[in-house]
């Protein structure tokens, strides 16, 4: 068993009771989502682990750069597996950064993977994630629904077209735009 389990970060009996009796069952309001509204509206199916974990995630890119990874493996034209392997090679050095826990929570929660992602575990994790992504329950909307999300706020430029938000207005998850003026 890996370090991510049903009582991860719950250090005493009261914390475990409060979480499992109350918080665990509550819906999630995601105020800062990196999925594009277009991906959600089109129920995008991720082609592989690189697209899912690294596509557009500038936080992971920053950690890869800090770990000395060449840009071609981050936003460049390297092969997708090589990009994922480059990410895996820096994950062990992320201890102390929330991204370390988030990465392993994602692997455990959605893919049942207990192993720590590293250069040594990269290939079997890549294969398992990619096998899962072929199944309908791993489409964008299904991943959101499986997460218990009821409100999801996308990060949008002030001039973005809201057409995809409009197409999602009748979906069970409320998808709202937020103001992110990075390009200004």
Each model region followed by its residue ranges:
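Metal-cofactor-binding active-site regions of metalloenzymes
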Residues: 2-184
């Amino acid at each position: 068993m890996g370090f991510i389990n049903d009582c991860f970060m719950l250090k005493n009996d009261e914390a475990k009771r409060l979480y499992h009796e109350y918080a665990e069952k509550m819906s999630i309001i995601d105020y800062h989502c990196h999925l594009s509204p277009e991906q959600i509206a089109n129920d995008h199916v991720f082609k592989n682990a690189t697209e899912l974990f690294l596509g557009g995630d500038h936080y992971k890119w920053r950690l890869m750069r800090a770990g000395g990874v060449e840009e071609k493996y981050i936003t460049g034209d390297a092969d997708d597996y090589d990009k994922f392997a480059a990410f895996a090679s820096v994950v062990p050095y992320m201890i102390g950064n929330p991204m370390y826990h988030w990465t392993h929570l994602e692997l455990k929660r959605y893919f049942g993977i207990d192993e720590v992602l590293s250069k040594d575990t990269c290939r079997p994790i890549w294969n398992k994630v990619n096998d899962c992504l072929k199944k309908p329950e791993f489409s964008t909307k299904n991943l959101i629904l499986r997460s218990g999300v009821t409100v999801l706020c996308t990060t949008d430029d002030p001039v973005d077209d809201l057409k995809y938000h409009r197409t999602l207005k009748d979906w069970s998850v409320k998808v709202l735009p937020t103001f992110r003026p990075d390009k200004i």
